[in-house]
Amino acid sequence: EIEEFRRFAGDQGRERGVTIAIEPLNTKESNILTSVAEACVVAARVDMPEVTVLADFYHMDEEDEPLTNIVDAGGRLSHVHVADTGRLHPGTGSYDYPAFWQALAGAGYDSRISVECNWRDFPTEVAPAMRFLRESFPG
């Protein structure tokens, strides 16, 4: 059923010029597609360029998912979400951002990255988060 729905979504995406990104969630939030590797299997079975994979650093860390799964996703990877420990903004925790950036480079990913976190005080936290991302990103 998941693959059938993804094919339907892919067809709809093709008609509208939209990419469908499968975002795996951690097992506290979902019981289906809980890793980038699983999402890649579904995307491969659907085999449509409109059906891709999203890597969310928070969910990957929650599941202790190896960052090599990002490298393995390669060209199927279409978007990335970042946060830090406790789902707070990047730069406040212990996530291994150098290894994450290296995995993205290994996948050939060079597109946008979204910060998806729990902001406690957006006006004061956004500048340090952006500074951290700019300073830690090797590109």
Predicted feature descriptions by range:
Residues R7-E15, A44-D47, T68-L77, P98-Y109:
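Acidic (Asp/Glu)-rich catalytic clusters
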Residues I20-I22, V51-A55, S78-V82, S111-V115:
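Hydrophobic faces of well-ordered beta-strands that scaffold small-molecule active sites
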Residues R76-H89, G106:
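A short, conserved beta-to-alpha structural element at the edge of catalytic cores
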Residues K28-V46, D61-G74, G91-S94, T124-R131:
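Distinct, well-ordered alpha-helical segments
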Residues S114-E125:
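A short, acidic, flexible beta-alpha connecting loop/helix-capping segment that sits on the rim
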Residues E135-G139:
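Generic C-terminal helix-cap and adjacent flexible tail
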Residues E1-T52, E62:
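Active-site acidic/histidine proton-transfer and metal-coordination neighborhood
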Residues P24-K28, F57-H59, D84-G86, W119-D121:
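Active-site-proximal loop/turn and secondary-structure-junction residues that shape catalytic pockets
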